[in-house]
């Protein structure tokens, strides 16, 4: 048995997004599939641990994951605190930040086959 969730707000925004964004998203992998209408969310507005919530307030376990949350989940306090701290100095600079070198060195140390990382 399939239960259809209430997704009125989500699909209304999806229609709006299609007018200005091809496939209603910036990345193909995030595009909602029409075949899963009423089952799969179109937009997520919140996440914590492995759970996410859509625009209509429906809660899901995120089996799709994203590039960031696949390792630690969403709203990981240690990471979020570090981000907030860095935001005071600015983010997304036009040149590399020293932290990039520190992180790359750590990754090369712990990944036996990695000589360099990006």
Each language-model region and where it sits:
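N-terminal alpha-helical segment of soluble enzymes
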Residues: 1-3, 86
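Active-site and channel-lining beta-strand-loop segments
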Residues: 41-64
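Active-site-adjacent loop/helix segments that line or gate small-molecule/cofactor pockets in enzymes
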Residues: 3-46
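Short capping/connector residues at structural and topological boundaries
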Residues: 26, 48-49, 72-77
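Glycine-rich loop-to-alpha-helix module at the N-terminal edge of alpha/beta enzyme cores
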Residues: 59-118
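Short active-site-proximal "capping" loops at secondary-structure junctions
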Residues: 35, 49, 68-69
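Short, hydrophobic/aliphatic alpha-helical segments
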Residues: 8-18, 51-58, 108-109
């Amino acid at each position: 048995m399939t239960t259809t969730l209430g997704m009125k707000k989500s699909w209304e925004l999806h229609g709006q997004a299609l007018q200005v964004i091809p496939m209603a998203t910036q990345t193909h992998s995030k595009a909602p599939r029409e075949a899963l209408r009423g089952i799969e969310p179109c937009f997520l507005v919140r996440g914590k641990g492995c759970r996410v919530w859509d625009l209509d307030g429906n809660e899901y376990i995120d089996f799709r994951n994203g590039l960031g949350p696949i390792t630690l989940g969403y709203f990981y306090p240690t990471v979020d605190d570090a981000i907030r701290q860095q935001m005071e100095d600015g983010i997304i600079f036009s040149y590399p930040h020293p932290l990039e070198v520190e992180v790359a060195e750590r990754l090369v140390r712990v990944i036996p086959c990695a000589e360099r990382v990006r």
